[in-house]
């Protein structure tokens, strides 16, 4: 038994010895390559080959070597450099680096670099040292220094260690800037010291350049410092204005205004104030100023000196030198602007003064100064007549006017001739009709009280000639140059002596220029009077007067025709007959007498009847005879036929038919109504009063005028009855009945006396109704 146990121990020792004994057999390199290749093929082994392929290493061992390189390089290793050092492909290094960064939170992979926490702590210490030295630092500077991304530096380095390794604080307005409290205190001290030393406005950029403080820090700390001044803005060109300077400005402006009562914009701008007007308003809120282009005048200066002096100048009928009462600093332009502004504000009547080179003349003074020029105008007018100068001027103007008329006739030939239409209408035998389409050219007014004015030489002829020359096809005609009888030099000679006594002779030409046209017109008017007084002009005056008279009567007939068309046909026919027997007969008489004068026939009675005119026409020359006879016949026909016959007579007499200006119809009707109202106020005869009242009411209600005799009063009252209320109709009807009663009764009878008393009592009511009735009343009654 014991021997067996010993045998077992011996065998165990041999076995242990066999186990502990290693084989000393060595494999060749070829065998090793084959073994490794076999293991790789069977995916039993993973290795990483070097770039030259001579060596290979396991990924785990390569990972340990990368970590060793990170440690050797101080916690920051560039993967490109690691790839070169380990002689391994960069892609393999990058894969393992990503795994290292993912597995180890203390290691970061940043832009192809491995960085561990030790390195981050190291650069945090460097940043802290730099922050202590400079007081302020930005992430952009650190990114440039450490060649690391700004986001990584801000979040993983600075903000992570802020308050621990890095002793500072983050700028609230700019998170990428960090500074120390000591730096802020230094900046405050610099800003406070710089601003305290400034006594005049200075650009903020200059201040920052001198003290070396950033602009954003300057503006953020300015309110905390509470400086003795203010910054104009936060823009790049802002300025700092100390309170002492603003006070100095205000004191200077107040002192200057107190002494002079005005302020110059240039002087204020030299103080550094850009908007002078706004500054003046702000500095003197309770003062009123007259703001001119160059200066601002105090309202007290204007009121107490200039306005008062102008009023005195007007009262004394003298002149005023404004330079003697205004500050000497003001230029001539300033003084003229002061005067113009005062006149615009209606402190005085502008028409009472004339301003010339700082001198204000009252109109009475100038009127007295140029009084001798009246005699000059008279003498020049006589000289123009005696020398034939004015007569030549009249001839040239007349020729120019005739040329203009010819041009108008040529233009009218191209238009539709409405007179042909009127001839067709007249041939149909209809009574009534109008003057539409008739060629007219007149400033027509009511028939009454216009004959005398029409006989005068038309002062508008010259203007008509010029307008016609400019406006139509008469381009070859030239306007007559105005005749200059009184010249500026003539007036200068007369007024220079008086002005020399006042030392104002340098203003003689400007004053003369003001009155040259006035006295020239006076001389022309006087020459016209002298010219019209000469025998050779009588014939021309007669022709012009007759022409205007006939045109005026034709316009009256046209307007009356519109009114009578509002009546029934039977009444209308009677009104047409009355119109032709009155105004038509007057036209026939005027033309017959004119033709008789042209034919050198003597007519004793100027109020001709139809037979007398026919007899006179037979004695006239052949060119007039047929036209006059036809016109006489037309008196018993329609208005259109009479107008056509009248136009024929006018053409044979070389008279112009003026065009219709319907725009003036309303004015003519209003003028006619005013004349009727004036006659009504002066009338005391009941029948005539009723007649006038009826015509006025008809014009007011219809907007047309009517030529009717007293026998048509009842028809007129019947026509306007619908536009009046019951009380008004009753008044007119009662008055009409009383008038008939008076006319039918014996003048001395009791019936006539009683009717007259009633008429006298009702007269005021009838007059008031006619005078005060309006279109508004018409609408209300309707």
Swiss-Prot record:
Top-level class of the enzyme under EC nomenclature: transferase
GO cellular component: endoplasmic reticulum membrane
Any single Pfam family the record assigns to this protein: UFL1_C
Domain of life from the UniProt record: Eukaryota
PANTHER family in the record: E3 UFM1-PROTEIN LIGASE 1
Functional description taken from the UniProt entry: E3 UFM1-protein ligase that mediates ufmylation of target proteins.
Protein's UniProt name: E3 UFM1-protein ligase 1 homolog
């Amino acid at each position: 038994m014991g021997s067996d146990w010993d045998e077992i121990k011996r065998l165990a020792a041999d076995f242990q010895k066999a186990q502990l004994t290693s084989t000393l057999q060595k494999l060749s390199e070829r065998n090793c390559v084959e073994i490794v290749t076999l293991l790789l093929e069977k995916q039993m082994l993973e290795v990483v080959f070097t770039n030259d392929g001579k060596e290979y290493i396991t990924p785990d061992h390569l990972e340990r070597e990368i970590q060793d390189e990170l440690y050797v390089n101080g916690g920051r290793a560039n993967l490109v450099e690691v790839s070169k050092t380990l002689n391994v492909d960069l892609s393999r290094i990058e894969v393992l680096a990503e795994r290292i960064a993912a597995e180890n939170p203390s290691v970061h992979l940043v832009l192809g670099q491995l960085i561990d926490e030790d390195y981050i702590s190291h650069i945090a210490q460097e940043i802290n040292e730099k922050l202590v030295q400079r007081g302020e630092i930005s992430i952009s500077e650190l990114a440039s220094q450490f060649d690391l991304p700004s986001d990584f530096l801000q979040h993983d380095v600075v903000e992570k260690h802020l308050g621990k390794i890095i002793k500072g604080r983050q700028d609230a307005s700019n998170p990428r800037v960090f500074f120390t409290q000591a730096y802020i205190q230094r900046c405050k001290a610099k800003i406070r010291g710089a601003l305290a030393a400034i006594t005049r406005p200075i650009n903020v950029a200059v201040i920052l350049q001198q003290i070396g403080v950033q602009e954003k820090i300057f503006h953020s700390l300015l309110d905390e410092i509470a400086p003795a001044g203010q910054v104009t803005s936060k823009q790049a060109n802002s300025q700092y204005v100390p309170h002492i300077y603003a006070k100095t400005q205000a004191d200077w402006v107040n002192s200057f205004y107190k002494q002079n009562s005005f302020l110059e914009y240039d002087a204020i701008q030299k103080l550094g104030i850009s908007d002078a007007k706004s500054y003046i308003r702000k500095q003197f809120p309770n003062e009123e100023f007259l703001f001119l282009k160059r200066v601002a005048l105090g309202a007290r200066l204007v009121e107490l000196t200039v306005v008062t002096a102008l009023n005195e100048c007007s009262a004394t009928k003298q002149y005023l030198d404004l330079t003697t009462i205004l500050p000497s600093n003001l230029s001539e332009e300033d003084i003229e602007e002061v005067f113009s502004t005062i006149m615009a504000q209606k402190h005085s009547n502008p028409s009472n003064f004339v301003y010339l080179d700082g001198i204000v003349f009252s109109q009475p003074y100038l009127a007295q100064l140029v009084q001798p020029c009246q005699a000059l105008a008279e003498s020049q007018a006589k000289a123009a007549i005696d020398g034939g100068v004015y007569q030549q001027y009249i001839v040239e103007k007349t020729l120019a006017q005739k040329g203009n008329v010819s041009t108008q006739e040529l233009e009218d030939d191209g238009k539709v001739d409405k007179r042909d239409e009127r001839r067709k209408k007249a041939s149909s035998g209809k009574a009534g009709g109008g003057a539409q389409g008739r060629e007219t050219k007149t400033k027509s007014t009511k028939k009454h009280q216009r004959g005398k004015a029409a006989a005068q030489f038309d002062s508008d002829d010259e203007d008509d000639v010029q307008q016609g020359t400019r406006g139509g096809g008469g381009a070859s005609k030239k306007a007559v140059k105005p005749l200059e009888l009184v010249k500026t030099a003539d007036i200068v000679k007369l007024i220079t002596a008086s002005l020399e006594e006042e030392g104002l002779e340098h203003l003689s030409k400007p004053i003369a220029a003001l009155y040259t046209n006035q006295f020239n017109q006076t001389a022309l008017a006087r020459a016209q009077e002298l010219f019209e007084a000469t025998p050779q002009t009588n014939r021309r005056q007669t022709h012009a007067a007759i022409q205007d008279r006939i045109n005026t009567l034709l316009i009256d007939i046209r307007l009356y025709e519109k009114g009578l068309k509002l009546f029934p046909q039977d009444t209308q026919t009677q009104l047409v007959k009355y119109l032709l027997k009155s105004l038509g007969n007057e036209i026939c008489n005027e033309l017959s007498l004119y033709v008789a004068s042209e034919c050198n026939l003597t007519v004793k009675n100027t109020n001709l009847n139809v037979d007398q005119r026919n007899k006179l026409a037979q004695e006239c020359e052949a060119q007039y005879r047929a036209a006059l006879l036809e016109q006489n016949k037309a008196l018993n026909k329609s208005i259109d036929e009479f107008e056509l016959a009248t136009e024929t007579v006018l053409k044979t007499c070389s008279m112009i038919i003026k065009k219709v200006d319907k725009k003036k119809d309303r004015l003519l009707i209003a003028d006619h109504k005013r004349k009727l109202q004036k006659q009504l106020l002066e009338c005391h005869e009941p029948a005539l009063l009723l007649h006038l009242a009826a015509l006025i009411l008809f014009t007011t209600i219809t907007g047309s005028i009517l030529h009717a005799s007293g026998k048509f009063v009842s028809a007129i009252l019947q026509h306007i009855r619908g536009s009046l209320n019951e009380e008004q109709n009753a008044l007119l009807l009662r008055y009409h009945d009383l008038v008939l009663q008076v006319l039918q009764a014996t003048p001395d009878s009791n019936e006539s006396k009683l009717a007259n008393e009633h008429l006298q009592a009702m007269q005021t009511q009838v007059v008031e109704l006619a005078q005060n009735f309006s279109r508004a009343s018409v609408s209300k009654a309707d």
